[in-house]
């Protein structure tokens, strides 16, 4: 689940990812991953449309966590982290980033980065970096940007 901060919290990017798994012997949910301050987005009921984060289960059992800015400024983007359960931990298996510049139609790009293998495709070109296993608790978006060959 995605958890918004308390209403008086002024942090810009303080939406957390918390994943619970059902206990095998009881009807209880156990915390499997806690990653506070991982997702950027609007959290207020009267927040800005186009900045809402989301989380959903995928058919293969992975989770997709999406954040976006499709509302303000010329730089519009959507980012999806694909989380997979590996060796009793939730890791970032994939990173997808789509960017567009509203004032420069040729200034956009998209990138799909398989974090586990290090293979990426950006703008139709194949890229390769070293594969990594990164728990969601340790993930920083800069890792995805580097894998996509984007300099910060």
Task: Walk through the language-model features, giving the residues of each.
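Acidic, glycine-anchored loop motifs typical of Ca2+
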Residues: 1-3, 9-10, 27, 59
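Short glycine/acidic-enriched loop and turn motifs that connect beta-strands
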Residues: 5-9, 70-73
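Beta-propeller blade repeat segments, especially FG-GAP/WD-type strand-to-loop junctions
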Residues: 10-33, 83-85
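Short, surface-exposed coil-to-beta transition loops
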Residues: 12-15, 50-51, 75-80
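Beta-propeller fold detector
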Residues: 29-36, 93-97
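Repeat-based blade/solenoid architectures
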Residues: 36-53, 77
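Acidic, small-residue rich beta-repeat scaffolds with periodic aromatic anchors
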Residues: 55-152
